[in-house]
């Protein structure tokens, strides 16, 4: 299963030129600054804009092929589209809004039913309300449920959290994670938030000025030093681990790194043993030492190997890429510290991780 998107679309001051081969499963994030082409790409896939030259194929369905002069209109494309703000019918109840999406699909073709959509998004208690009596986060969950009830082969989400405050975002993120875990519907997710991408996406496409700078698994791509992602204050890595222990006395969760016996400890509520989850480590929260120090308040000290380095976003710092038993790690340190430690590729030393963010 795969998604092929080849687009060339020119405006007076902007050109979109993409050739992407994307996974046909999971969540793919289109990530980049404002004006990079994220939403234009999504609109072309939806058929809301027509690329002058291009081909769009979702698994075995071709929606556009300019060489064959084929263009499937938007209403005939099996997709769901979630905008920044949910466009709900104000005069209809939540249930009637959802039924509007459901009625578009013949019963024999429905892959998501009303009960499943309302349970996944936690909206069963809202069915008799009207949109004007809902919070922003609730309206967005209704919009997502309505898109799912069209039983799409592809779900497009255009910055669905952008219009929400931080509290509403934190409320809706767990529901988006459930969609990822429980539905076999590929998602293209537009965002300029690296935290959202790190938490939700499996694959990332980094866009800039209408072109793809990189495309690959989230963990690998965020750790690349040759991309602009590495230069900002948000530079860091996303690692997948499994819960191996919980200490109820100190309320510490122990996470085992993939393919090794190394562990990370983090203050967190208890989670089921064996549960897979992601965590993020910012480069600014990693320091380096030539030897381990047990007499330290820093819980997480790991043996690492230096891979390479690049200048950081200011002249005083460098960004060092490290290997931790096969998993990447970044450290942002001063050039003075680099020289004091005589850092070089292949060198073995200790990383001291001052903070870990569990993405769940």
Curated annotation (Swiss-Prot):
PROSITE patterns noted in UniProt: ABC_TRANSPORTER_1, ABC_TRANSPORTER_2, MODC, MOP
| Location in or out of the cell | Cell inner membrane
Tell me the GO molecular function terms.
ABC-type molybdate transporter activity; ATP binding; ATP hydrolysis activity
Domain of life of the native organism: Bacteria
Q: Does the keyword NAD apply?
A: no
Domain spans labelled Mop? 295-360
The principal location of this protein is: membrane
Q: Which NCBIfam families match?
A: modC_ABC
Q: Which family does it belong to?
A: Belongs to the ABC transporter superfamily. Molybdate importer (TC 3.A.1.8) family.
The entry describes its oligomerization and partners as: The complex is composed of two ATP-binding proteins (ModC), two transmembrane proteins (ModB) and a solute-binding protein (ModA).
Q: What does this protein do?
A: Part of the ABC transporter complex ModABC involved in molybdenum import. Responsible for energy coupling to the transport system.
Record-given protein name: Molybdenum import ATP-binding protein ModC
- Protein species of origin: Pseudomonas fluorescens (strain ATCC BAA-477 / NRRL B-23932 / Pf-5)
Q: Which gene encodes it?
A: modC
């Amino acid at each position: 299963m795969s998604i092929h998107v080849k687009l060339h679309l020119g405006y007076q001051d902007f050109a979109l030129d993409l050739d992407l081969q994307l996974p046909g499963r999971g969540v793919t994030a289109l990530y980049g600054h404002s004006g990079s082409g994220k939403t234009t790409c999504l609109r072309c896939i939806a058929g809301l804009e027509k690329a002058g030259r291009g081909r769009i194929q979702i698994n075995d369905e071709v929606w556009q092929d300019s060489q064959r002069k084929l263009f499937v209109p938007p209403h005939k494309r099996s997709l769901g589209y979630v905008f920044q703000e949910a466009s709900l019918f104000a005069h209809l109840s939540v249930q009637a809004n959802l039924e509007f999406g459901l009625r578009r699909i013949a019963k024999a073709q429905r892959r998501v039913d009303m009960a499943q959509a309302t349970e996944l998004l936690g909206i069963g208690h809202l069915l008799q309300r009207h949109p004007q009596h809902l919070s922003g986060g609730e309206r967005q969950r209704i919009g997502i449920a309505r898109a799912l009830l069209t039983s799409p082969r592809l779900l497009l989400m255009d910055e669905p959290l952008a219009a929400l405050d931080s509290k509403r975002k934190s409320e809706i993120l767990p529901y988006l994670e459930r969609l990822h875990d429980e539905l076999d519907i590929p998602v293209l997710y537009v965002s300029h938030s690296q935290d959202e991408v790190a938490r939700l996406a499996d694959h990332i496409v980094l866009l800039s000025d209408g072109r793809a700078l990189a495309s690959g698994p989230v963990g690998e791509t965020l750790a690349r030093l040759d991309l602009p992602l590495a230069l900002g204050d948000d530079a860091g890595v996303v690692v997948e681990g499994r819960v191996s222990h919980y200490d109820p006395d100190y309320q510490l969760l122990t996470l085992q790194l993939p393919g090794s016996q190394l562990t990370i400890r983090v203050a967190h509520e208890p989670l089921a043993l064996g549960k897979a989850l992601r965590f993020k480590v910012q480069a600014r929260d990693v320091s380096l030492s030539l030897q381990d120090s047990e007499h330290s308040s820093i819980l997480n000290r790991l043996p690492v190997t230096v891979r390479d380095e690049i200048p950081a976003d200011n002249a005083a710092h460098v960004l060092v890429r490290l290997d931790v038993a096969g998993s990447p790690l970044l450290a942002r340190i001063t050039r003075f510290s680099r020289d004091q430690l005589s850092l070089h590729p292949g060198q073995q030393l200790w990383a001291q991780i001052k903070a870990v963010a569990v993405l769940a």
